Amino acid sequence: MVAEHQASPANVRVKRIAGALGAEVLGLNCAKTLSGADVGALHRALTDHLVVSLPDQTMSLDDLERLTDQLGGRMVTPFVKALDDRPYVIRVLKERADKLNFANAWHSDLTYLPEPPSFTLLYAHEVPDYGGDTLFQNQYLAYETLSDGLKQTLRGLRAVHSAGAAYGTGGYLDQVKQHMSTPVAPSPDAFKEVVHPIVVTHPESGKPALFVNPVYTVRIEGWSHGESQALLQYLYKHGLNENFTCRVRWAKGTLTIWDNRATQHNALNDYAGQRREMYRTSVAGAAPKAA
């Protein structure tokens, strides 16, 4: 269903941060329950810009969970240990002595699930003096700028997704977890596979988007590993063009929300010796539909 564009409340101001995607949203106080009109304005900004950053928020974890519910409802993040008393909230933490950070690779969140999240919320509690930005990429543009012939080919294909390489027993995060402060929980369950269309239709904008990413997309259904990698690596190289990206620079109190159905992101690890503490929730989504 294509979202209707209605006038935003007078208190809400939206300012683009890059040409490809991303906007700053001003005038909302997320420490309070947002009105229906304000939620609608925030949702429209997400539909239009895919990534929205709300600076100078003073939010509790109750506030973060309430806003998550207002945007569609909470969901659990597998293979990452949640806070003891909050099963839907994870702490993304890098201590000063840590060499590695969490999510330092291009990916879309939880695409290894049958129903990946629609949105992700990330709130900055403590940030380094410099560095620690997050890069975002527009999967609409990644698809739109392909040739007509390749677009047609991709519309008939599905890809296999799995968390095994990242979160499986013996996988990357299992091997390096002692060097990270974000508590991961590797499991043999991470090797389970799901299949999604390579090109999906966004349920609100109605636009087609690529739906593959280097971390969780394993292969193309029915293709060999070599055949799959040849095409997938081309799509990654094409889609991760810097002209399709934006950068969010964090400050204490920044809340950033992104549309996981049409973006990838990458958390930079360029702040050695400094501490960064963030809190993250995910909004429940639906099974991706083929374009």
Residue ranges and their predicted role:
Residues 2-255, 260-291:
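Non-heme Fe(II) oxygenase catalytic core, chiefly the N-lobe of the double-stranded beta-helix
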